């Protein structure tokens, strides 16, 4: 294991972990990182009294020309059930490999994104207890905000390029997320 206290680490599989079926049915992500996600539909980690982290596995083997994923309907149902099991004051962070928003000049490629992106994004927006959506996949960093009617906005944070050289228009090397009571603040951190 990478750390002795696996409950302090969450590892979410991405398309590179599940591009193609492995020989002999071996799931290498589960073999090497399974302790950090678990065997259930969701990875759940209670951060504190106000915040719960929910990890989704939307990566699956595809045809060699695609890098897309799918959030299963069973994952959505399990998340609904989880949210319902907590008080209305509890805030949730969903962690998933694939983004739900993109930079303005991004050229969308349906073979590289979530197949069910729009219904998943709409479902999340209809659940105001989900306050933060963390993802990767696109090797650029950004923080987007989606407004909600009569509810706190949804913050969507991509820190997928934490180790790479900054691209034009990027303002952060990675993001620091501060959770105070029911408030969330995202600070861009720039390394020179």
Locations of regions flagged by a protein language model:
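A short C-terminal boundary segment appended to hydrolase-like catalytic domains
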Residues: 179-192
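Short coil/turn segments at beta-strand junctions that form active-site/ligand-binding loops
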Residues: 7-8, 88-91, 129
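Extended active-site neighborhood of metal-dependent phosphoesterases/phosphodiesterases
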Residues: 1-81, 86, 119, 150-156, ...
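Short glycine-enriched, charge-decorated loop/helix-capping segments at active-site entrances
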Residues: 67-70, 106-112
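Conserved beta-sheet core of the metallophosphoesterase superfamily
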Residues: 109-180
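Active-site environment of divalent metal-dependent phosphoester hydrolases
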Residues: 13-23, 61-66, 99-103, 130-148, ...
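Short acidic, glycine-rich surface-loop motifs adjacent to enzyme active sites
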Residues: 83-104
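Structural motif
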Residues: 53-55, 93-95, 134
């Amino acid at each position: 294991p990478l750390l002795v206290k696996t409950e302090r680490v969450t590892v979410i599989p991405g398309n590179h972990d599940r591009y193609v079926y492995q020989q002999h049915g071996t799931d290498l992500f589960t073999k090497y990182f399974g302790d950090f996600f678990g065997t259930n539909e969701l990875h759940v980690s209670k951060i504190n009294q106000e915040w719960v982290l929910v990890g989704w596995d939307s990566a699956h083997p595809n045809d060699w020309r695609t890098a897309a994923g799918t959030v299963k309907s069973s994952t959505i149902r399990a998340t609904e059930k989880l949210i319902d099991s907590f008080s209305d004051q509890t805030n949730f962070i969903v962690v998933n490999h694939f983004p739900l928003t993109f930079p303005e000049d991004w050229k969308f490629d349906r073979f590289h994104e979530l197949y069910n992106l729009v219904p998943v994004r709409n479902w999340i927006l209809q659940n105001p207890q989900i306050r933060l959506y963390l993802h990767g996949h696109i090797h650029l960093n950004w923080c987007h905000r989606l407004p909600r009617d009569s509810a706190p906005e949804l913050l969507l944070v991509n820190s997928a390029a934490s180790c790479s050289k900054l691209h034009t228009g990027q303002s952060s090397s990675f993001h620091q997320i501060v959770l105070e009571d029911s408030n969330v603040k995202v600070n861009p951190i720039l390394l020179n």
